[in-house]
């Protein structure tokens, strides 16, 4: 039998309404009776405890010194997404021209509007929660973990498809100038940039910046030469304006084109011209303070300019029809336009530039996937070994190796036919954009107290989401069969994450099956007075051969702790946190941490916390609830010290609405915001 405990709420008013007394401050005496746990002892998480920690001043000083690391400056960070973002111009203009014909500039202009809308969305969300993960991170802080994992699946698909398609497209551009083996060269590009990714993001960014600046020079010359050629030869543009709209295929049926179909389906194709826009949010932790917003501006502006100018320029240089026209030259459209405008030498230059910048998009995929998977691994959505870094360069070698093997295998399986992966990427990218707009709305509605540098109007969020949904329908109506391939790839990725989410349930089912099919000779033996500790995971006999190995795995998964920072001993908030952890995490160990400054003045608060922890530990026997009091200041250094002391990644540390800390602190601690 436990002791009688006092629980004191934080409010002290007593009201009487209609003769009924309602108490805002109460003392409740509760007799806590600890019943014997049922089932195997290894399933019992153990009794909660109370602990007080003092942070040595030298430890905090060392942490603050070690936190100074090399971060990406404005243009280095811009170049990484800029190659993917601006490189999409190479194929988006031709795709739009095939759908829109003479109205090609209109969908490209509409996409430029989408870019400006999403630039505000990303600026608001990421400055509020500046952690790697992009859409996954935004949804994780506004919804549940399973919903956020859907965005993670789309993100992984997006990067795999981007790397595969970009590598294939790069080799195809180069093959217009020299005869090369397509499959071997594509895999060679994936391998080369995988090795470059192993050198680290700073080294990558320098190479990316050189590629980015060279690409801007080439596109500038091409745009200007197209304008000059159009002025000197105005008949080409006039004749293009007199052509009919291209026919369209809707659900397998060929229909006559119209202005509506040209704009509608062209807009769906043009949305692929802003690919890479979301990548910067997956390595925001590697960027210096204030850089993220500048990367969006620096990448969006030239993409908007070149999309529209080249959309008009090719109509002034090349006829829509004919053997050498726009429709016939869609695989290397800009190279063909360069040949007509300035000659074969410039066509060769454009082809080489296309090869280089599309290869740079592969590098962006490596950087983005490393940031995303590292975050998923620390959040226990993917295996934790993926978050390990090599000592030499500090890069995620397991992620890079796995990404290369996956991308290279797709190149071999598809035999460099990028049609399927283009479709997979289309739905993955547009799905991510739609989910991000939804996350931005939820953040604005549910997390208004979180400080942010930018506040996007509701009209921006709604209009951006509507335009992305329209683009999804345009692609769906154009070729519904692609959705089947996307679903297959999505299911494969989602299955891996489902296994991680339900690995305890799967292991329990496996143990039950082993008891039936392979019982051990100790099936009837049970252990008495066993208490599990994390360091000595010896378990009783389970009644199945190999059962103790399975039981140890379950114990290890459940014993990984989660930390919740709590300012006040609030019954409602703590109960919500426990419910959230049970619904979204595999662990059975929750540590409530309270950081206080003065022991004497906070003595009553600490005692209330201890009582609450004991109460909830009795109420929820399937989860162990510990209370940890820490004397010091609540700041990033304290959080980092606790992370190392308790071996808990910061992404597995939770907090409520952070109204108790400043915007600068919120942006640097990197913890997850939960509860309403």
Model-derived features with residue positions:
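Cytosolic C-terminal regulatory domains/tails of membrane transporters and channels
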Residues: 1-62, 516-676
